[in-house]
């Protein structure tokens, strides 16, 4: 009867820690409502993959028999071999996004670029702390505030920390209502937070709405080829939404596809949360660097808005810059809530929403930039390479966004 106790005897303290991590993620999903569609399956999966001799991961049984585990198979097929799961999720995300507020106020595009600063600041910090370049780049992409992008970039770059990166990315996305107000108050005054902004939306024609995702895909594909999979599927989802002839498919992409892929992605990514890989001091460092990235994203966007105000007669509420992260629509709602806390009559939701969807585009451009630059830089001199990625990455994002701005201006002129 010893076989009945084999599993118990094989338990390690690291596996017990992972059970606690899994239960905590499940608790955060159910009790606090933090990204439940992903944290709940991720938490349950963390328990599954850390059970001794678990049948969900590949095992060699007595007699040399190989037993294939379903979660390990899903990880190899859906993430490692093709990154198909995070990429397919972008179809659903694109179908959810309304670019109308952004297209009616194209200057909001700039805040999406400014709010990617945390990515590159975090890459530099990770490099200074001794992470190899590809791992530092993967950790930095947590600052994209975009879970699928974080997973895809870390997988393409072959990071050893994909599980910790995924947990950090989605956990901090859920904590946007806590992290962003703290960061914004660090660099703004009450007077700045009370600035009112006029909202005079210009109608956006159907032609522009259809042409925009096609043109953005082509431009970004030429400027940052490594972003094509990310931005292409995002814009394909948006084209399904805007074309007007695929209403049922648009609803399916927004609801059934997005929910199903998110569920599968959560439980699949848990394969990389095995105790021997996850319970390390590096995981704690990644969580700290990820938080730093989120804070610096917000600060970068806010400081860009404050810089622009030096040259504008009609001032921008600097909090709008903080909405330029990819956490949509959470960030725009947080900004509106903060504005009304300072002044109950201050409504800046639509401007914040425009900056927020700009962040969705900028984050996938940043993901492609990071992949390309990290692969081409000198892997030996990590800190210098991180500085190079920082300079070229931010310049590349702003260049791509400015080209898209020019495109929108041309489309609006032509459609009149």
Task: Please give the residue ranges for each predicted region.
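Intrinsically disordered, low-complexity non-transmembrane regions of multi-pass membrane transporters
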Residues: 1-11, 16, 62-67, 182-211, ...
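N-terminal alpha-helical transmembrane segments of multi-pass membrane transport
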Residues: 1-66, 71, 409, 415
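Hydrophobic transmembrane alpha-helices of secondary-active transporters
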Residues: 25, 48, 79-103, 237-240, ...
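Interfacial helix-loop-helix linkers and transmembrane-helix boundary segments
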Residues: 31-39, 58, 74-76, 96-111, ...
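Alpha-helical membrane segments and immediately flanking helix-loop junctions
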Residues: 77, 81-82, 91-96, 110-121, ...
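Alpha-helical transmembrane segments
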Residues: 160-178, 289-297, 320-323
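Membrane-embedded hairpin module used as a gating/binding unit in multi-pass transport
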Residues: 168-245
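Transmembrane helical segments that form the transport core of multi-pass membrane transport proteins
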Residues: 216-301
